[in-house]
Regions:
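Helix-loop boundary and gating motifs at the non-cytosolic
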Residues: 2-51
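Core transmembrane helices of Major Facilitator Superfamily
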Residues: 22, 103-115
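Intracellular juxtamembrane helix-capping segments at the cytosolic ends
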Residues: 29, 110-123
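Residue-level signature of mid-helix packing/kink "hotspots" within the transmembrane helices
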Residues: 51-59, 143-144
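Helix-to-loop junctions at the C-terminal end of transmembrane segments
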Residues: 57-70, 150, 154
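Helix-breaking motifs and short loop linkers at transmembrane-helix boundaries and internal kinks
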Residues: 69, 90-95
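Structural signature of the two symmetry-related core transmembrane helices
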Residues: 72-87, 165
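Paired small-residue
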Residues: 95-103
Length: 167
């Protein structure tokens, strides 16, 4: 199993960091929205914006990848995602957060597309199931671990948003 993991170790580490940041942001926004006094209905709309963006991003991924390539697409979408996380602290209103969630969802689904296409392209057919099972363990483990990052500071502070953007 180790010979299978070593060549993709850096990519799996990148996935772990990406999902730590995304998982942290998802929970952080729900808590911070409550602290800001947003209604449950507003929070429902805000959080659903991620999935609207996720859907939109599926249509944007291929044209962007074809136009600028996998590496530039990855860098571009990682930068957009990081900026959108940080902007949540500056645009503290439900409409702003909804729009930022759409941007975040689009960016992340394009990042997942690039990552999974790299894994798919690297892996021989007979090993693909093993590689993607490792990928899913990293994926879900990172999302679970991300919740513990909330212990590092108050949700009302900038620190957790900065950490989410860094990851």
């Amino acid at each position: 199993m180790l010979p299978l993991i070593l060549p993709i170790g850096a990519l799996l580490l990148g996935v772990a960091l990406l999902l730590l940041g995304g998982g942290l942001l998802n929970t952080l926004l729900a808590i911070r929205g409550g602290l800001e006094g947003y209604s449950d209905s507003s929070m429902g709309w805000i959080m659903s914006g991620y999935f609207v963006g996720f859907f939109i991003g599926t249509f944007l991924a291929l044209p962007i990848i074809q136009r600028i390539g996998h590496i530039r697409t990855f860098a571009f979408c990682a930068a957009i995602a990081a900026c959108s996380v940080l902007l949540h602290v500056l645009l503290v209103n439900p409409v702003g957060w909804l729009l930022l969630r759409v941007v975040t969802g689009s960016s992340l689904v394009i990042l997942y597309t690039v990552i999974e296409s790299w894994l798919n392209g690297y892996t021989p057919s007979e090993q693909r199931g093993k590689v993607f099972s490792i990928y899913m363990v990293v994926n879900l483990g990172s999302l679970a671990l991300a919740q513990q990052l909330l212990r590092l500071d108050s949700p009302s502070a900038f620190t957790l948003f900065a950490l989410g953007a860094i990851l």
